[in-house]
Amino acid sequence: MTHQTSSKNLKKLSFEDTQIAFASKSDFQLRKSYWIFAIMNQNWLVKLGTFFIKLFLFLHLPVKKIIKTTLFGQFCGGESIQECQTTIQELDKAHIGTILDYSVEGEENDKSFQLTKNEILKTIIQSHESSAIPYAVFKMTGIFNSELLEKYQTEKGLSEEEEIDFLKSKDYLIEICQEAYNQEVRLFIDAEESWIQNTIDELCYEMMQRFNHKTSIIFNTFQMYRVDMLENLHHAIHVAQDQSYFLGVKLVRGAYLEKERLRAHEDEYSEPLHKEKEATDRDFNLGIQACLDHLEQVHFCVGTHNEQSCRLLCQWMEEKGISQNHPHIYFAQLLGMSDNISYNLASSGYNVAKYVPYGPVSAVMPYLFRRAEENSSIAGQTSREFALLQKEVSRRKNL
């Protein structure tokens, strides 16, 4: 793709184009999304609704169907990989990839870890078999005991018995990464809380050294709201260059803000996060630049709902003469959110994917509650979604 074509596409790129953003939604689906975000736009309604859903589930009242057609239907692909096929196909029609995200938060025991491992292996096979699924993804806490991950990065370390359990989980990790390597499937390892992240990083880089010599298979996630993360990214790039492997990077702002601040306050240590959102935004955008500057060595994905960061990346790609569909660069958003970004980027020829959570309704509820609460607490995010849906409803009325 030429520099000229890139410039032309950038000029026509608009995150305000709701006709493109919601083209795949019928009038009924559009109105349903409109009402979901109308409710989520009211913080007190989110809290009230969450309380009653938890209560009804606890009392085993028949609310599964209501949940499945509302919150679950908005943010999840289905209860199984098979149920996600319709979503995968719909996204693919718009040239948007799917990242199947098994979002079940199971118990911390070996039986649960094995079930999760087996499900992750299924998503890797599914990705290998379908060009519509460019990545697989998982969390370390799906296969590791979180207390062991935390203890591993302390001075005390693990006991002999704990070491056995830890190594068993590490075997699951190696099995997952080996399968991704064998199937040539790119694999995101999601970031988690700072008190277990050092362990996750260590394991992740060990897997990169093992599997990323031909191309980026293993991707680590960098949460740019952490004060040390930009430096960590630069260091990771340097190590990858020094040891001759490809660095897989997923850039995010960060998902555990309130949890991190609460723990820092309770345990009386300095918060590892930026005090101001502007500093997070700055580091996120500098992280994009660092990846672009080392594009031969780095494959990266920007996981963001921030329009400015997406536009900046598009602008920098144009300035450097990098084609929209460069295989080392991806954009990603969550299913059911920021369709104005995803669909308009895809329409302009950029590589885009949606995170598509799936799993049994009752098991995915903790994820959905967090999503609803996070949306209502992120300044402007829900009202932005609501305003765009409102705009498209009005546009269709006037046709």
Model-derived segments and their meaning:
Residues 2-399:
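Positively charged, amphipathic and often flexible ligand-engagement surfaces
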